[in-house]
Amino acid sequence: MNKWRLYYQVLNFGMIVSSALMIWKGLMVITGSESPIVLLSGSMEPAFHRGYLLFLTNRVEDPIRVGEIAVLRIEGRKIPIVHRVLKIHEKQNGHIKFLTKGDNNAVDDRGLYKQDQHWLEKKDVVGRARGFVPYIGIGTSLMNDYPKHKYEVLFLLGLFVLVHRE
C-alpha cells in the first residue's frame, strides 16, 4: 500500500468520525439533551426492549408528568436509569418531586435511589424519551455485558477502515 492510499484511508476515516460528531452535537443543541441512550436492561418491557435507542429532550420549561419515560442520573450510580414517572409530589411552593418505576419491575425505584432518598427532583433528569429506534443499540448493550470485547471490536473496525480498499 503506497503512502497516498494510506493517507486517503486515514482522511476518509477522519471524515466519517467528524461527520458523526457534528450530527451528535447538532442533536444536542436541538434537543437540549446530551445524547441518545441505549436501554441496557429489560426493566421497561413491553414498552421498550433491551437494545432500543431512545432519543431524548430535556427542556427546562417542560413540566414532568406522570407516565413519561424519564432518563435519570442517580447519585452514586454510573449508568443512567430509564424508567416511567409513577407519582408526582408537589409542594405548596411549587417544588416538584417524583417517584419512578420500571414497567417490568414489581416495585418502585426507591431501592435504587441513594440511601434515605424517597423522591427524585428535576436535577436528576438527564432527559425524557421522545422517540426510539428498535434494537439498533443491541451492540452497545452487548459491549456493556462483555466489556473486554469492546476494545477488540474497536481495533478490528479501525483496522478494517485502514486496510479496506475502494
UniProtKB/Swiss-Prot annotation:
It is a single-pass type II membrane protein. Disulfide bonds: none annotated. GO terms for cellular component: signal peptidase complex. The keyword Cell membrane does not apply. It is found in: Membrane. GO terms for molecular function: peptidase activity; serine-type endopeptidase activity. The active site is at S43. Its EC number is 3.4.21.89. It comes from the Eukaryota. It catalyses: Cleavage of hydrophobic, N-terminal signal or leader sequences from secreted and periplasmic proteins. InterPro entries: LexA/Signal_pep-like_sf (IPR036286), Pept_S26A_signal_pept_1_CS (IPR019758), Peptidase_S26 (IPR019533), Peptidase_S26B (IPR001733). Residues 1-6 are cytoplasmic. One of its GO terms (biological process) is signal peptide processing. Keywords: Hydrolase, Membrane, Protease, Signal-anchor, Transmembrane, Transmembrane helix. Residues 25-166 are extracellular. The chain crosses the membrane at residues 7-24. PANTHER family: SIGNAL PEPTIDASE COMPLEX CATALYTIC SUBUNIT SEC11, SIGNAL PEPTIDASE COMPLEX CATALYTIC SUBUNIT SEC11B-RELATED. Belongs to the peptidase S26B family. Putative component of some signal peptidase complex which removes signal peptides from nascent proteins as they are translocated into the lumen of the endoplasmic reticulum. This is Putative signal peptidase complex catalytic subunit SEC11B.
